[in-house]
Regions:
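Short, solvent-exposed mixed-charge patches
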Residues: 132-133
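N-terminal glycine/threonine-rich, aromatic-flanked beta-hairpin/loop signature
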Residues: 49-92
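An anionic, turn-rich surface loop/hairpin at beta-sheet edges
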Residues: 87-112
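Bacterial signal peptide processing site
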Residues: 25-28
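Short, exposed beta-strand-loop hairpins at the edges of beta-sheets
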Residues: 108-129
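Bacterial N-terminal signal peptides that target proteins for export
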Residues: 2-13
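Tryptophan-anchored aromatic micro-motifs
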Residues: 32-47
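C-terminal motif of bacterial Sec signal peptides marking the signal peptidase cleavage site
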Residues: 20-23
Length: 133
């Protein structure tokens, strides 16, 4: 009888642990897009190219963070539709977004390539190439 009670207690504890662990975090909703991406190259529509140092896009849920290490960090909202990425940076200034390949506080990017390691975004203003960091 005691063995049956101990077995039931262990079963209940195991179920509770599984429930607690599974409830602790948000699952990624954007597939391969979620994570931190380092900008490797920006090709502007004008033909100019730039290879920024230590500039990143971080994507999680419906939030995007643009960060240039020791310089700036901008946070906004984004919507991922599979072939497009819509970014809205409501409190940012345009001049703060230029180093990230954006020329406005609202930007639509076409997703030209997306794998677990490589991302290419295209807007009317620039083409951005990233590697997963």
């Amino acid at each position: 009888m005691m063995t049956l009670i101990n077995t039931k207690k262990r079963y209940i504890v195991a179920v509770l642990l599984v429930l607690i662990v599974s409830a602790c975090g948000k699952m990624p909703i954007n597939g391969d897009l979620d994570g931190r991406w380092q900008i490797m190259k920006i090709e502007y529509a004008s033909g100019e190219e730039e290879m920024p140092e230590r500039a990143y896009y971080s994507v999680a849920l419906h939030t995007i963070n643009l960060m240039k290490v020791d310089v700036t960090s901008q946070t906004g909202n984004m919507e991922y539709t599979g072939d497009s990425l819509f970014v809205v940076m409501p409190v940012s200034k345009v001049e703060d977004l230029l180093p990230f390949g954006m020329n406005g506080t609202e930007q639509r990017f076409g997703i030209k390539e997306l794998t677990s390691k490589h991302l290419v975004l295209q807007s009317d203003y620039a083409r951005l190439e990233f590697r997963k960091f």
